Amino acid sequence: MTLRLNELAPAEGAKREHRRLGRGIGSGVGKTGGRGIKGQKSRKSGGVRPGFEGGQTAIYRRLPKFGFTSQIALKTAEVRLSELSKVEGDIVSLETLKAANVVRRDQIRARIVLSGEITRAFTVQGVALTKGAKAAIEAAGGKVEE
C-alpha cells in the first residue's frame, strides 16, 4: 500500500471537536463557559502574566543574579584553520579575513582555533591564536607575527 499526499489524515481521535462555549445549559459549557464563577481568570481579558505566582515573590526574584555576557566575546570572531584557505595571498590579518568574508565586518578582533586542515603556509599578523593553531601553522611552514 502506497501513501499519497492527498490521503494524509490525522490519527483517529487525535483532533477534538471545537465546543461552542456559553450556548445554553444543555451544551454542558453554557453560562460561564467552563471558566468557573468570578475571579480574574473568568474575565474576558483575565489572566496573569507569565511567572506570576499570585503575589508571592516570584522564583526569578527569589534567586540571585549571576553571570553576564561579555561584549568582547560578541565582537571576537572564531576562525577555523580550514577557513584560512579562503584568504587570498599568504598574509592573514583581520583585514584580509574580512575581505575574504571569513569574518563579519563588525568584528573588531579574531582568534584562530585548531579545527580542520591547513593547506598552505601563512604569515599571521595581529590575530590571536590558540596554542594548537599556532603549532599547526608553524608545522606547515608558516609564521606568526604579533
Swiss-Prot record:
GO biological process per UniProt: translation
Keyword Ribonucleoprotein: yes
Record's keyword terms, sorted: Ribonucleoprotein, Ribosomal protein, RNA-binding, rRNA-binding
Disordered, as annotated region: 1-54
Free-text function comment from the UniProt entry: Binds to the 23S rRNA.
Recorded family membership: Belongs to the universal ribosomal protein uL15 family.
Listed name of the protein: Large ribosomal subunit protein uL15
Annotated gene: rplO
